[in-house]
């Protein structure tokens, strides 16, 4: 047998060693990728499992270091735990939110949006009821509500005007009564002063007892004259107001009669013109026929 040279043996050994090393490296890389995939699945599914690789699942070949592999997987496990916790918290909060939304009575529409756009929330049954007359549409309701408000505002405005006019009438009546009372008091004072002056001259020579007895009936007469004068002034003011009203009504009637008479005269003139025009045309036609 021929001997194999030493160089060729060394080359073969190097090739075998490199092949084995590459296989081991590829296998470790594949296991790393698989563990990362499992971590992602566990993070999204919320399952917990041990991430440290067991010694039985590893190939014990040349160049494999279990301690380095354990050191490599420690931070990965810590990161996966934090991710799982965050994912579980987010999932629980999402579940609570979904349950709250499912139990909401106004889930598919907002109340303010319903008020602004009620037509979009109407169903077929509501539309049928509206067409049959059982139900009123929201637009009709709003229009009726607005009309009622308008009517109420008109009524309140009329009531306010009536109250104001009534107050003005009361004020004018009070002013008239005050003026008449002042004038009657002034007139009574003047009459009383003149009466006392006249009564002093003939009674100078009489006794004091006579003067005292005469003072009381004089005051009583003055009060009676004042009351009678005030009554006369009030009655005279009421009579004056009635006379003014009657005068106004008479004037209005006269104006209406004059207007109607003028209108009747104009109508008669127009009719006369028309008849005269017809008569003139008839006469002209008769004259033309005679000439022929």
Curated annotation (Swiss-Prot):
* Covalent link (Glycyl lysine isopeptide (Lys-Gly) (interchain with G-Cter in SUMO2)) residue numbers: 8, 76
- What is this protein's name? Uncharacterized protein NKAPD1
Output the Pfam families linked to this UniProt entry.
Answer: NKAP
Q: What PANTHER family does the entry give? A: NKAP DOMAIN CONTAINING 1, NKAP DOMAIN-CONTAINING 1
Matching entries from InterPro entries are given as: Nkap_D1
Segment Disordered: which positions?
47-67, 122-292
Q: Where is the composition biased (Polar residues)?
A: 128-140, 180-194
GO terms (molecular function) for this protein are: identical protein binding
UniProt keywords, alphabetically: Isopeptide bond, Phosphoprotein, Ubl conjugation
Composition-biased stretches, type Basic residues, lie in 147-173, 197-215, 247-259
Q: Where is the composition biased (Basic and acidic residues)?
A: 280-292
Record's keyword annotation contains Transmembrane = no
